[in-house]
Each structure stands twice: as structure tokens, then as C-alpha cells.
Amino acid sequence: MTRIYIATDDELLIASGNNGLWTVGTRLAGLSPRCLAVDPLRPERVYCGTAGHKLWHSADAGASWGAAGAGIAHADVTAVAVSPRERAGAFGVLYAGTEPSALFRSEDGGAWRELQGMRALPSAPTWSYPPRPHTNHVRWITPDVADAARLSVCIEAGALVRSLNGGATWLDRGPDGPLDTHTLLMHPRVPGQLYAAAGDGFDAPGRGYNESRDGGETWERPDEGLEHHYLWSVAADPGDAATIVVSAARSPEAAHAPRNAASAVYRRAGHAPWQQVRDGLPPMEGTTVAVLAANPSEPGVFYAASNRGIYRSADAGITWGRLGAEWPARYQDQRVEALVVTD
């Protein structure tokens, strides 16, 4: 069975599919879900960060939920991740990021401690989120797939910072790293291979897509073929690290405001230029920027979710089709905040 978790503006949607038949349910109504994570070794454990209601967790694949953020100092949990390498008993080590920017670690899913060194970095006074310039937040957390001590954290906006020792000390943003990273992934089979979809390209075309082969030490920006430079989401084929899809728009408003939305999905294979993919996807106009995902157990398969519904590609992103899962009409006026797909 495939399970798809989607955080919308108002609630969490869970679609469960088997042999092409889908059932849909909703949870956490009114809690404003913002981010999601699934324990890779225990996929029935799901975590959801919210705006104003801290962190929630489920131990039964989303059927029931309980509060899990009592030790997190801030109400807005904007990023959550589970380490694929480090475990404490039955739990994967859990990280949660907040607004204002702070990073917390838990080894049991409930007791938290802040990794305070991140907030003391020299670049911290310059961090600022443009819609609310007085503050900023942790946008993404990426534990290393091979080294449990390595961790990358993206601040919106202002920095991509790293720790090589589990958060005890931190390396500040590098001179050539992205500053406004929206999604940061490490390929599950290629340690050190990072993909970053960033907003940097809005002001500096050519800097929206970033990739690193050495865990963030250095960066490359292959952008030939990209005509939309404000990048939001990225997913990599679990079976082929060189096949990638990204979602993009010309501006933040075109990405996120349903009434003015105009977004695109691009695909890149190997060293070929990016190509916009349209077959089976909704029209650009009126479609908010998609959140993309891949299921580690499905090589060659990608998923996309936007205000127009849930879409799947079974040919590595070339063609797409809308899933039969029910998509409430009210979602057309909302944005998708997060997407996770698992078995």
C-alpha cells in the first residue's frame, strides 16, 4: 500500500492507495500543518509541524495523532526531519525547526533540547524572511544519509548552515552557497549528493537550482533550459541520481497565490538541459507551485501535489497523470505546504 501525506493550509490529507484504488481522509483540521516527516525505518511513525500548534505525531500511519512538541520553545514548527542513520531505541533521532529560527533535537519523540550554537552563527543577524522581515525561520532540515553526525539546515532567508558533529558546533554559510533554499535533498543512494531548490534565482537568474557532490562544500548551478528561476521543490529519482524534477515560477506571487498562480515543472536527465514537462499536468495558469516527492521504494516514479490535485509520473517525470484520490474543491484556493510518500 502507498500512503501520501499532504499538508494543506487548513488540514492534513492522507491518501492510501492499493492497486489503483484510493481512499482519502483528513486529520488535524484547523491546526495549519506546515511540514511533514516519516521515520524511514518505521514508516507508521509520522510527524507534522504546524503554525501555532507546535509538533504532532502519529504512531499508526496517521489514523490518530497526539501533541509531541511540549519541549519546543516556539509555537510555529516550520521544518521537521528524522535521521535515517541515527536511532535511539525505537526512535529515529528527530529534528524540528521553528520560527523564529531555532533547532531542536529529540531522541524519544517527546523530550527536546535546543541546539543553541546555530543561533550564534555570525550570519544570524542578517537572516530575514521577506514577507515578515523582522523574523526568519528554519525552512528545511537534511540529515546526512550516510554519516549520522552531519546535518544541513536551511534558513529562510539568509543561510544554508551545516554541522559535522550532530549540532554541537556549526559551519556558517559558505561564500557560494544558496541563501534562500526552499527544499534541500540528499540522494538516498549517493552520499554527499545534494539538490537545492532556491528562491535565489528570483533576484539572480541562474541561481535557483543548486547541486553539490560533496555535502555542501562546493556548489554547481546547471540551469540551461530553465525559464522560471524562482524554484520551490525538487525530487530525485531513487534509482538514478541524475534524473531530477523541480517546480518553479517567475516570482513568489506566481508560485503561491492561487488567483495569480502560474507555475511549471521541469525535468533534467544526466547532463542534458532542463526541459519543461506538461504532459498530464494541469495548465500553468491557476496552478500553485507543486510540491514534489519520490517514494524510496519506487524507482522512476515521482509525485506532485498542488492546488489542482495529486499527480504521479511512472516514467521518471516525462508524463504524468492525476491520481484518482478525491481532491476537495476548497483546496483549489489553498496552497500545498508539504508532501511525503511512503509504503
Feature names for model-found ranges:
Residues 1-343:
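Extracellular glycan-interacting surfaces
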